């Protein structure tokens, strides 16, 4: 709960949290090492000195610390767990729905669990999405369009395969589509996070909400034009918020 200077209490739902494991023991290859080191560099450069973590602590977020950060010392009342699989880089994935579900199971009244899908997984992926939705009663998914999968280094929401998955999500009652469209982390490709494909699917799927995580950075202007036009497009401000402190001008 956040209390304003006037004493007003505001119920806080944190829309973007990750319960990750980027530790050396979980790294599958050099790319896993590159990813967590770049991720840590963002943390180091955008956090106040008093809030900077040691690298070993940052590499693998433990459940006790996460709960205390969010709900004891932090202002959160509830939080949405957003998965980021990256199974080409990490043996057990970086931050899977399964890993997140352990947090949800331990603290069911505190966490909202989102799932994920990747249209490159074909019919098997559609079956998995149905099973995931049935198991966890999903209302949202987190998509990572720049994720590497074999020789593929990303996909677009406007691809035909993506349409099949969005249609399936709609039928399953998965209304909130969270899409990472923000700063690139090594070794992922910047252009694979281009926000332009949101425009197409937002028009085609009016009953879905598209939450553009990190509001399209570094393509903020493009995002703003799309969000102005499309009434079902919203900004997720994670990562964007720290820039207010680091670059207030």
Feature roles, as predicted:
Residues 1-249:
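Helix-coil boundary/capping segments in enzymes
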């Amino acid at each position: 709960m956040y209390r304003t200077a006037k004493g007003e209490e505001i119920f806080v739902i944190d829309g973007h949290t990750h319960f990750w494991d980027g530790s050396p023991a979980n790294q599958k290859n050099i790319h896993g090492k590159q990813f967590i080191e770049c991720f840590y560099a963002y943390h180091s450069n955008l956090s106040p000195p008093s809030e900077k973590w040691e690298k070993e602590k940052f590499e693998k977020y433990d459940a006790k610390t996460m709960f205390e950060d969010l709900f004891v010392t932090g202002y959160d009342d509830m939080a949405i767990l957003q998965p980021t699989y990256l199974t080409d880089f990490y043996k057990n994935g970086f931050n899977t729905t399964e890993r997140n579900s352990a947090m949800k199971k331990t603290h069911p009244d505190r966490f909202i669990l989102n799932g994920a899908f990747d249209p490159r997984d074909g019919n098997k992926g559609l079956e998995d999405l149905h099973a995931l939705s049935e198991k966890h009663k999903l209302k949202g998914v987190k998509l990572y369009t720049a994720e590497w999968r074999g020789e593929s280094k990303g996909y677009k929401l406007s691809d035909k395969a993506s349409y099949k998955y969005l249609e399936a999500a709609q039928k399953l009652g998965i209304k909130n589509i969270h899409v990472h469209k923000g700063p690139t982390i090594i070794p992922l490709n910047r252009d694979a996070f281009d926000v332009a494909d949101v425009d197409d699917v937002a028009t085609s799927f009016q009953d879905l909400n598209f939450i553009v995580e990190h509001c399209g950075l570094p393509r903020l202007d493009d995002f703003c034009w799309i969000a102005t036009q499309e009434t079902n497009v919203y900004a997720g401000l994670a990562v964007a918020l720290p820039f207010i402190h680091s670059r207030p001008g």
